[in-house]
Amino acid sequence: MSSAIERKSLDPTDEPVDEVLQIPPSLLTCGGCQQSIGDRYFLKAIDQYWHEDCLSCDLCGCRLGEVGRRLYYKLGRKLCRRDYLRLFGQDGLCASCDKRIRAFEMTMRVKDKVYHLECFKCAACQKHFCVGDRYLLINSDIVCEQDIYEWTKLNEMM
């Protein structure tokens, strides 16, 4: 679940911020360090207030309060996009074997098709591809350069 991070200010004359709060700083407690927030700028996320340095990914520790960052909150964990997708990302099906691809698995992608690494091989000769190898995508089949002519000829007969 993705959550918005709101940047707040205690300065009523500061125009660029999203919203100005008229709350005495002593009443705000940081959701991370549990200390009072006396900073001019602070964040609001997951129904709590945060020092800018305290709102961070629970796994990798990257700051989530930076401009353009998204906060993902699931199972009580604050996560950056990368870690969220690594843990809970969308599973899919391999275009070759139709078996499940887990979110953390390494894959090969060709256009809108996704393949397990072990399934990313020539449909004709079963040779696994190396970096720089040329191939053609025919429907969901990947065919190496050497087998393109035979593969298309064989499929035309079917």
Curated annotation (Swiss-Prot):
Pfam families per UniProt: LIM (PF00412)
GO CC aspect terms: nucleus; protein-containing complex
Entry's localization field: Nucleus
Keyword list, A-Z: Developmental protein, LIM domain, Metal-binding, Nucleus, Repeat, Zinc
An annotated GO BP: erythrocyte differentiation
SMART domains linked to this entry: LIM (SM00132)
The protein's name: Rhombotin-2
Domain LIM zinc-binding: 28-90, 92-154
Species annotation: Xenopus tropicalis (Western clawed frog)
GO molecular function: metal ion binding
Gene3D superfamilies, per the entry: Cysteine Rich Protein
Function (record text): Transcription factor that acts synergistically with tal1/scl and gata1 to specify embryonic dorsal mesoderm to a hematopoietic fate. Induces globin gene expression together with fgf.
